[in-house]
Amino acid sequence: SSAASDVYKRQEHPEENIERIIYRSLRVKKNVVENDEHEQGQRACLNFGHTIGHGIEAVKGVRGRRTNGLFHGECVALGMLPMIEDKSLVRRTRAIYRTLGLPTRTGVDKNKVLSYMQHDKKSTGSTITVIKVPGLGCWRADKIPMTELPALLGIKENED
């Protein structure tokens, strides 16, 4: 959508627009929560990045409690990257992270993240629900087999 594109263009120079970006983001989140108070539909989009993000957070630790830890938002931001299916959008998102001084790599053992994710509250035994973004301004909730998690995390089949 053109509205999503405008927001994204503004975020490519976040230092010039940070207050507007934060205000608009909070307004959007508030509307989503108010329109889906019981998490029956649209509110699921707010889980974008959290499934992998919580795994990163569990392994890396939270800044303040662990010296080299990351903030919750940094973990979620890193967890968003593998969920973006459009590679050019991944590159643009990484560029924005760099501009904001956010990490673009986790620096953690992906197998440890995988192990944590296999016990995530959004998992139901052999499947887990993740939020994927096929392109700018659109998302979908996917129930994927746990066996797809290694590939999603970029773990090679024979990697230990």
Which role fits each region the language model picked out?
Residues 1-8:
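Short, small-residue-biased leader/transition segments that mark boundaries at the very start
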Residues 4, 42, 125-127:
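A structure-centric signal for secondary-structure junctions around beta-strands
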Residues 9-10, 36, 139, 145:
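Short, solvent-exposed coil/turn linker segments
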Residues 10-111:
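Active-site segments that bind and position negatively charged phosphate/pyrophosphate groups
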